[in-house]
Amino acid sequence: MSWKVVIIFSLLITPQHGLKESYLEESCSTITEGYLSVLRTGWYTNVFTLEVGDVENLTCSDGPSLIKTELDLTKSALRELKTVSADQLAREEQIENPRQSRFVLGAIALGVATAAAVTAGVAIAKTIRLESEVTAIKNALKTTNEAVSTLGNGVRVLATAVRELKDFVSKNLTRAINKNKCDIDDLKMAVSFSQFNRRFLNVVRQFSDNAGITPAISLDLMTDAELARAVSNMPTSAGQIKLMLENRAMVRRKGFGILIGVYGSSVIYMVQLPIFGVIDTPCWIVKAAPSCSGKKGNYACLLREDQGWYCQNAGSTVYYPNEKDCETRGDHVFCDTAAGINVAEQSKECNINISTTNYPCKVSTGRHPISMVALSPLGALVACYKGVSCSIGSNRVGIIKQLNKGCSYITNQDADTVTIDNTVYQLSKVEGEQHVIKGRPVSSSFDPIKFPEDQFNVALDQVFENIENSQALVDQSNRILSSAEKGNTGFIIVIILIAVLGSSMILVSIFIIIKKTKKPTGAPPELSGVTNNGFIPHS
């Protein structure tokens, strides 16, 4: 009873880390803080020898029976696994070739294991396949079912022998078949064979279905008791071991298995378990949706591109851009350090005032609004724009209200669901504090008509700079055009003046010519012949 009191007391004195989510109105994003890290820092290798027994020399020639069916399954599985092993060796050669590894790994269901982790695991598997290493592991397991063995390259591995099927075959099945052949009336014997054979057949199926590399650690590859012993042997602190034992399902999901090969009547494979060497440092997650401002049918849209998980590790801030690199269990976040990127401490400024920070906060821009929902740990961001119907609802009463166009933040206390057209999103029921940080949407700082074409993952200050440069070019073009128009006006005036002067000169010339050729009205008519001097004009 005393140990229960101790546990209850420890729970009472342990500080509770509540979650706090802030909605940043300026950038249509949320930051959720209060998580604690569980970061993978290494791998722990466990080598299994699953011993089948001398089934190849057992034969059933006395007709169909349950024993014969199970025996045929076992022999067929061994042959299949040998084929898988041969194919896997060829595939691993490609994995170690940098030019081909990404294509080969893309065809394997890696689950949450990274390509780098699998490549490292394959290197260890190649070492274990050496005849001297296989012999050393078998020798270490001659008198025990579990032993720590050191490979030739100095890597220490935990070796585990699984002998239940072999013991049943040698001590029970072989004796019964030799005595009564396969037509055994004892149904219990057939059922026992099936039970002992189940783990072996499931291991074969998993390696066969996944090309020799499993995406996680099943109970057949490693029982719960075997997992607990392996975790307890890990070179890490008691607190970290305790946390991993409490989250064995996560350890299984983050691990993977690699087939070593078939050696006689033994199947050898290795299991890579994650070592979570960093725990309880602060972590937070950033989520975002498009923020758009419209004008006369044109839009200026921005979306934060620094979304993902962030964790403190050894004084640095590690960013996990792929949300799948981290998984939560309660307020703990399990992440793979190999997938993280170190970023400056100033990156947090993007969560305060994205438009005035000196840090290059990354965004994507566009001129076409996209309606979407981004679920956050304590609510949802809803980007609702033209031509789309958006609403929030309750599981009990249905739709509560329609949402306005633009970016909205819905807490999981305000609603149970968010609906965009015919798609319904269920909000989480995680408890925590929610806050709204008011601010003018940064997208409204831009003129939608002059907003540039789509840009991906650029610094926000670069967007401002590009628009300023574009505006400067527009202003310069206007000045040049204005000057050209003024020059053209003067040129036209000169042409008109020249034309007027030219026309005037022509008219004057014509007038002079006409003037000269014109005679007075009273002059005598010009006559041909002799002049009459006696003619006296009237006065």
Curated annotation (Swiss-Prot):
Signal peptide: 1-18
Domain of life, source organism: Viruses
Keyword Disulfide bond: yes
Chain positions covered by the region annotation Disordered: 520-539
S-S bonds: 28-407, 60-182, 283-311, 292-301, 326-335, 350-361, 384-390
Motif mapping: Cell attachment site: 329-331
Swiss-Prot/TrEMBL GO biological process terms: fusion of virus membrane with host plasma membrane; symbiont entry into host cell
Glycosylation sites: 57, 172, 353
Family: Belongs to the paramyxoviruses fusion glycoprotein family.
Protein name listed in UniProt: Fusion glycoprotein F0
